[in-house]
């Protein structure tokens, strides 16, 4: 019986070492050598400190910043570990809301967001990105139309001409991946950092 078990155990050990240790370590080393910034998490640094990642959205609620998509991520309630509380852009608990199209809770949230956005920019159609969440709750990007919709609010809050901000948004637009995958997009963190830089000039 041992003669039958020995080859199986040797194969199990060899495959575990190859697929569980050698391959992941080789890929990590290769990624670090070829794409060092991406392998480190695509971190964005300003003035010697890390301000975020280009891959994970952040919560911006101030009027002088562009806002990302709504996030419905949660965190454990400090008062009751059996419950959760809203914690937008909580990277430790990436998820969507799981609310379906017939959900009254979802309908009320969208209506509230639509009303607030319509009051902010009357007469302009509200882009869908600004009222819908992403599957992860951590989407760092919005459509160019969603960024342009917010230009009047940011311009008023910063005392800047709208045309300068529109030009900045246009300059921040990233094309489709490989020219065919996904949609054109604007990274909200990168855009807000560019707005801060423009305001300092």
UniProtKB/Swiss-Prot annotation:
Keywords associated with the record: ATP-binding, Cell inner membrane, Cell membrane, Ion transport, Membrane, Nucleotide-binding, Potassium, Potassium transport, Transmembrane, Transmembrane helix, Transport
A GO term for molecular function: P-type potassium transmembrane transporter activity
InterPro entries: KdpC (IPR003820)
CC terms in the record's Gene Ontology section: plasma membrane
Entries under Pfam families matching the protein: KdpC
Primary localization class, coarse: membrane
Compartments (UniProt record): Cell inner membrane
PANTHER family noted in UniProt: POTASSIUM-TRANSPORTING ATPASE C CHAIN, POTASSIUM-TRANSPORTING ATPASE KDPC SUBUNIT
Protein purpose: Part of the high-affinity ATP-driven potassium transport (or Kdp) system, which catalyzes the hydrolysis of ATP coupled with the electrogenic transport of potassium into the cytoplasm. This subunit acts as a catalytic chaperone that increases the ATP-binding affinity of the ATP-hydrolyzing subunit KdpB by the formation of a transient KdpB/KdpC/ATP ternary complex.
Assembly with partners or alone: The system is composed of three essential subunits: KdpA, KdpB and KdpC.
Protein name per Swiss-Prot or TrEMBL: Potassium-transporting ATPase KdpC subunit
Taxon lineage: Bacteria, Pseudomonadati, Pseudomonadota, Alphaproteobacteria, Hyphomicrobiales
């Amino acid at each position: 019986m041992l003669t039958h078990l020995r080859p199986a155990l040797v194969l199990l050990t060899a495959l575990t070492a190859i697929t569980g240790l050698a391959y992941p370590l080789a890929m990590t080393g290769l990624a670090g050598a070829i794409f060092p910034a991406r392998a480190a998490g695509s971190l964005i640094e300003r003035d010697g400190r890390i301000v975020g990642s280009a891959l994970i959205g952040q919560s911006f609620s101030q009027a002088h910043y562009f806002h990302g998509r709504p996030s419905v991520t949660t965190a454990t309630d400090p008062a009751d570990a059996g419950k959760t509380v809203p914690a937008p852009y909580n990277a430790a608990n990436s998820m969507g809301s799981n609310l379906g199209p017939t959900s009254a809770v979802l309908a009320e949230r969208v209506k509230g967001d639509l009303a607030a956005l319509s009051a902010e920019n009357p007469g302009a159609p509200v882009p869908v990105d600004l009222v819908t969440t992403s599957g992860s709750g951590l989407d760092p990007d919005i459509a160019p139309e969603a960024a342009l919709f917010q230009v009047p609010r940011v311009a008023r809050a910063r005392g800047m001409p709208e045309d300068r901000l529109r030009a900045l948004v246009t300059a921040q637009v990233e094309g489709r991946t490989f020219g065919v995958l996904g949609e054109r997009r604007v990274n909200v963190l990168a855009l807000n950092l560019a707005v801060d830089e423009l305001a300092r000039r």
